[in-house]
């Protein structure tokens, strides 16, 4: 018989009755019934009930003193449970093991929080004792699910003709839109490596190297603040790149992967392929967001022209100054109490708006509300037609400069979806957002900057760049760039790449970069493009967000084994931490006075 176990704790069935077995695991629960002691023994696979009887008083007494989460090995005989004690919620619920002997492999101290329930514990304690937290069923299952998803992704990609690569972790700093994690070089004092924000340049270089289809479950590092769906330091993505492809080729390659994943690991309804494509400008108009939740049926409408000649002075004057008006329908909300409308106004104010106008259309078609008196009957009918308003509905209005009005309308749409319980249940709604602006205005400098990935191919190529003379014309340029969105969560960005040096130099010059600066920052890739680069494109769906959706987790830390907290700290390993002066000296690093003072405190 094996030293520790003959079976796992999820394995024993009624067919194993009278079999002598040995099990090892953690003490999950203990119940003392006087002449009987029951222990639920848990391992990675499941739970088996162990019973100690007064036929062996010493063994039963020893079992009654076992602390929760102690690791034990038990030898005994499988017996059938009586009819009234069968537990159909457990795979092993028809049997139990009558213990003959047990040994304690490792005794547990007093627990900082309860393991055998899903009752919330303080997150700081959970992260500090993550090894305990990971024993809890929900989190344990999430990590198993993550492994299964990644394994299946590898299978799908390999079956589709992709080759898996590993790219460098120590690389050069590049502008990916977030701060780098820098690593000082001992051999080159004063110089730094950067942890890759993404393997962007390397995967493109692999295409130039003659490989056709690349993928990697890639670790990415960005020094950015935490969010519910974003880890503050490290995350993983399914990094993909393909040669000789169009945007549509990328879509038709990734859609089956997403569909297969979401149908395999959930019973919910999944959007059929091909996924709907929504141009960026249309998405901002209809949904007030570039990551729309299509479970929400509300469609925003532009009603600027209706208010342009209305008697509503505030909107009319705003329109003269370049503002717009967006209408956000609220289905079947006309009869709701005044408190609902006040609540929506308070929400808009909390989002930085001056307020939120609205109209209620009764079941008989009568219009009421603070805006009604400023509109003619014809304008009210035009409003209903333009915004698809029916009798019994209400409609809210957002007025501001185009970008601000769109974003406010989008937030109101989301809030209405929640308040009115409009979201379609038990489904995953996918869509592509396409035709992103190539450039944007930098809010701090007021100058032209790349809106997303600087390596994207502008639609129209170099001709489009050369023909755009004014700022307005430059801001109208679009890129072969796309996002895949599911239930309002951006799962990935991707693009057809700019593989021609002359187009890259021109695109960067418009954003204020000289050829020398481009060569300095992206020399390796530019040099490669001068030796025959294939047209190529790619995408990089976020592994963490995919797992988060499939696990129905509300926080990304619930699907990562050892996450950082919101302050980018690892409470288990005490990172980041100060290092000895000797190590700093070897790296030619000197702490600032304030950093030195903090180090001395510790």
Curated annotation (Swiss-Prot):
Top-level EC class: ligase
The reaction(s) this protein catalyses: tRNA(Asx) + L-aspartate + ATP = L-aspartyl-tRNA(Asx) + AMP + diphosphate
Similarity comment text for this entry: Belongs to the class-II aminoacyl-tRNA synthetase family. Type 1 subfamily.
Binding site for L-aspartate: 176, 222, 452, 497
Segments for region (Aspartate): 200-203
GO molecular function: aspartate-tRNA ligase activity; aspartate-tRNA(Asn) ligase activity; ATP binding; nucleic acid binding
Keyword NADP listed: no
NCBIfam families xref list: aspS_bact, PRK00476.1
Record note on quaternary structure: Homodimer.
Residues that hold ATP according to the record: 222-224, 490, 542-545
InterPro entries for the chain: Aa-tRNA-synt_II, aa-tRNA-synth_II, aa-tRNA-synth_II/BPL/LPL, Asp-tRNA-ligase_1, Asp-tRNA-ligase_1_N, Asp/Asn-tRNA-synth_IIb, AspRS_core, GAD-like_sf
GO biological process, one term: aspartyl-tRNA aminoacylation
Transmembrane segments: none
Keywords noted in UniProt: Aminoacyl-tRNA synthetase, ATP-binding, Cytoplasm, Ligase, Nucleotide-binding, Protein biosynthesis
SUPFAM superfamilies given in the database record: Class II aaRS and biotin synthetases, GAD domain-like, Nucleic acid-binding proteins
Site (Important for tRNA non-discrimination): 33
UniProt keyword Ligase, yes or no: yes
Name recorded for this polypeptide: Aspartate--tRNA(Asp/Asn) ligase
HAMAP family: Asp_tRNA_synth_type1
PANTHER family in the cross-refs: ASPARTATE--TRNA LIGASE, MITOCHONDRIAL, ASPARTYL/LYSYL-TRNA SYNTHETASE
